[in-house]
UniProtKB/Swiss-Prot annotation:
Protein EC: 2.5.1.131
An annotated Gene Ontology molecular function: transferase activity
Gene: mfnF
Enzymatic reactions: gamma-L-glutamyltyramine + [5-(aminomethyl)furan-3-yl]methyl diphosphate = (4-{4-[2-(gamma-L-glutamylamino)ethyl]phenoxymethyl}furan-2-yl)methanamine + diphosphate
Pathway given in the UniProt record: Cofactor biosynthesis; methanofuran biosynthesis
Origin species: Methanococcus vannielii
Protein name per its UniProtKB record: (4-{4-[2-(gamma-L-glutamylamino)ethyl]phenoxymethyl}furan-2-yl)methanamine synthase
Length: 222
C-alpha cells in the first residue's frame, strides 16, 4: 500500500488477487485505511477468501444454471478456480501452479473434466462446450462477488481510483469493468504499468523500491 500511495495514487483502492485470497485495501491520504486483523477485514469487505487458483468451485455456489435448469452441485473437492481460470484463458498453464484436485495435469482438457465432476459427471455424459458453460456460470459468480465487495469499500471511503495487481489481474479487470462504464472510476493495472512479473510479486517489488528510495535519500543527506 505504501508503494502504491507513493508512486501511483494517494487516494485509491488496491485490489490484489492471488491464488487463494483477494485483498481490498483502501488507501486514504497516502495511508492504508484497512482494518488490522483478518476477522475485521472479512467483516468490512476488505478480505475475500476467493483466489484465481485454489478456491473450490462448490464454495462459490451450491447451485448453478445448467441446461436452463437450476442444478445442485457436489460439495466434493472436484474442481477449483484454477480450472475455470484456465479454461476461460484468464491464466496460462504455467500460472496454474498449485496442485490440481485430482492430481492430473493442469491443462484445459483435464480442467474441463474436473469441472464436469462438479455435476457428478464427465465428458462422456456432458460435452466440452457444456463444461465450458459451467465454467462461465461459476466465473460470473466469482466476478460478481469481487465487484460487490469492491463497491462497498468504494462507497465507504469515496474512492474511485482502483489499482489492480496479482495473478488474478485479468479476472479483476472483468469484475470491475462495470465500474468503468460510468467514467467515474479509473482502473490502473500494475501489470500494464510495470509488467507481469511485478504484478505477480508486487509486495516484493514494492519493498525493494521503497528500500532503494530510502537508501538514495540517506546517500543524498550524507
Amino acid at each position: 500500500a505504501e508503494f502504491v500511495s507513493q508512486n501511483i495514487d494517494k487516494n485509491c483502492i488496491l485490489v490484489d488477487m492471488g491464488s487463494t485470497t483477494t485483498d481490498i485495501i483502501p488507501i486514504v491520504d497516502g495511508k492504508a485505511a484497512s482494518n488490522k486483523t483478518d476477522l475485521e477485514r472479512l467483516m468490512n469487505n476488505e478480505l475475500l477468501y476467493v483466489g484465481s487458483l485454489r478456491t473450490p468451485l462448490s464454495f462459490l455456489s451450491n447451485k448453478i444454471m445448467f441446461k436452463d435448469t437450476i442444478t445442485n452441485v457436489s460439495s466434493e473437492y472436484f474442481a477449483i478456480t484454477g480450472d475455470i481460470s484456465l479454461v476461460l484463458d484468464k491464466i496460462t498453464e504455467m500460472d496454474y501452479s498449485c496442485d490440481t484436485p485430482d492430481g492430473k495435469p493442469a491443462d484445459k482438457r483435464n480442467s474441463l473434466i474436473r469441472i464436469s465432476k462438479v455435476l457428478c459427471s464427465d465428458l462422456n455424459q456432458i460435452s466440452a462446450d457444456e463444461s465450458i458453460n459451467i465454467a462461465i456460470e461459476y466465473y460470473k459468480i466469482l466476478i460478481d462477488l469481487i465487484l460487490e465487495n469492491v463497491k462497498k469499500v468504494s462507497e465507504k471511503y469515496g474512492l474511485k481510483n482502483i489499482v489492480i495487481t496479482g495473478l488474478g489481474e485479468e479476472i479483476l479487470k472483468d469484475a470491475l469493468s462495470e465500474l468503468t462504464k460510468s467514467n467515474e472510476f479509473n482502473i490502473i493495472s500494475i501489470k500494464e504499468r510495470y509488467g507481469k512479473d511485478v504484478s505477480l510479486a508486487t509486495p516484493s517489488f514494492s519493498v525493494s523500491i521503497l528500500l532503494k528510495n530510502e537508501l538514495n535519500a540517506k546517500l543524498n543527506r550524507s
